[in-house]
Amino acid sequence: MTTLFHRVARGARLLTVASALSVAAFAHAQAVFKVTTIPEEAASEQIRKFGPLVKYLERTLGTKVEFVPVSDYPAAVEALVNKQVDLVWFGGFTFVQAKLRSGDKVVPLAQREEDTQFRSVFISQKDSGIKTLDQLKGKQVSFGSASSTSGHLMPRSFLLQAGLEPERDFKRVAYSGAHDATIASVVSGRVDAAALDITVWRKFVADNKVDTSKVDVFYTTPPYFNYNWSVHADMPVAQRD
């Protein structure tokens, strides 16, 4: 990681990203600066969440900025690799995938402080009797997208550390595709338990979108590195600075 990366990471969030891209001249002479993210939630929620960033970047860069939702995690990777977008919000795993797919031509630009100590949670219905990871044996368990760091890769890693092999020890392994769908699968009873991004869970709780008297967290993972904003290496260095 570069000195720029560490400097920008300390600032975090919208101002961090905007200041990292503060050179307003676009060497590509493009009409629209395009931003996307791994689709952790419904497209409508992504558009709402990233709306302030779009407006801020438009003011800062002096050009039109468009948020472009993608269908799934691999699509976010391919969008940056093929330079269909300019800036992407990746999880740790999708960032690695993009680096590999591009031949090491994806550059991490910014990371929030909280993403250096990120966590996932496992949730279940409170009357299920599930209180530990070991009690997931023989149960139906859902992850998010197979390419999700916080919704699959890291939770699976911690399960393996606990001696649990999902395909061997669980009755069924499901993939919901997104964190909000993961929560819904537990609420509806389609699965017994599930793993997801802690920030999405906290937002659902804060917005009263889930009844924690019925569904709640029974395990929180240790911390790990996760999200970052990335650009293609072909973006001029002056722009990144």
What does each model-identified segment do?
Residues A31, T36-E58, V70, F93, ...:
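Bilobed "Venus flytrap"/periplasmic-binding protein-like clamshell domains
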Residues G92-G103, P155, L160-Q161, V187, ...:
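A ligand-binding cleft/hinge motif common to bilobed small-molecule-binding domains
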Residues P74-V88, R101-S102, D134, A178-T199:
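Short helices/loops that flank or line small-molecule/ion binding pockets
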Residues E66-V68, V173-A174, D216-F218:
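General small-molecule cofactor/ligand-binding pocket signal
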Residues T2-V8, L15-L21, A27-A75:
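N-terminal hydrophobic or amphipathic helices and topogenic motifs
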Residues V106-Q111, D169, A194, K214-V217:
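Short hydrophobic/aromatic-enriched beta-strand-loop microsegments
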Residues K34-P39, E114-V121, K209-D241:
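Periplasmic-binding protein-like
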Residues E78-Q135:
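Acidic, polar ligand-binding/catalytic clefts
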